[in-house]
């Protein structure tokens, strides 16, 4: 759309108008105090409160955002939406104030501990006065806790402590469904992941299956009702979860943000497989994906490539919640019918 109709442009116009009103308020106060000329200008610079500007501006805006800005007088501000859709973390001491959308960036850059970094709460703003004072002010009342799940699942750095544990848990929770699909035949099932960002969820899935296998070993030993022989014990302990690096991504490309016609052509050349990694016609192949959006790569490339290994069964699982609605996280996905979940529902 034309630039003048974009949300950022409208927000800047509204904020500029409110800033003018804040300057006007201080101008009147300065005159009432008997100040003139340069003294009025200095008074305005020292008394403009960005929290007043934000309170009157941001109440009219909807959706997820972290807005950052700088005024001509040196006031800096960062504000998070009251629904908590977009993430924001900050660190401040006597020398620096810094804000980012992800905690690991701050930890790595400034060698900080997890506990050193604060989350900017929904509806709050981090303000840096022109004199260097940094404060956090409540601008709008919190209206919910609706963190963007797609950002946490796909875009966020997997090195974040919370994100890492979440992704592992999402993978582990798939254990019962996968067991049912493979008829509990772990001995003839190989586990792998696609794409590379699904690796953490893959470890979670493996953890779930390792727990299951260990429980089965304990039950088999207890069922003997006696001390097992060396051969029996060796047979029981031989059961394990098989994992392989089956798929290899040749180029670092994300097909879901590629333009329509180029997307299908690109998807067919993204992956290759490790030949000989499974027993043809004998092994099931379980592949975990961390986010299936349109399913373009899945349909155009992955399933065809995996089939070259001749597995007994291919099981595709996704650790992500279903992506059901357009314009998710602002990505250009305007049509509902593009989504893999929508197409699968219609097919069923």
Residue map of PLM features:
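Conserved short alpha-helical segments that host acidic/polar catalytic motifs at enzyme active sites
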Residues: 1-121, 127-189, 194-195
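Internal, charge-rich low-complexity segments
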Residues: 9-33, 203-229, 331-348
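Gly-rich Lys/Arg/Thr-decorated short loops/hinges at beta-loop-alpha junctions or inter-strand turns
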Residues: 37, 149-162, 244, 248-258, ...
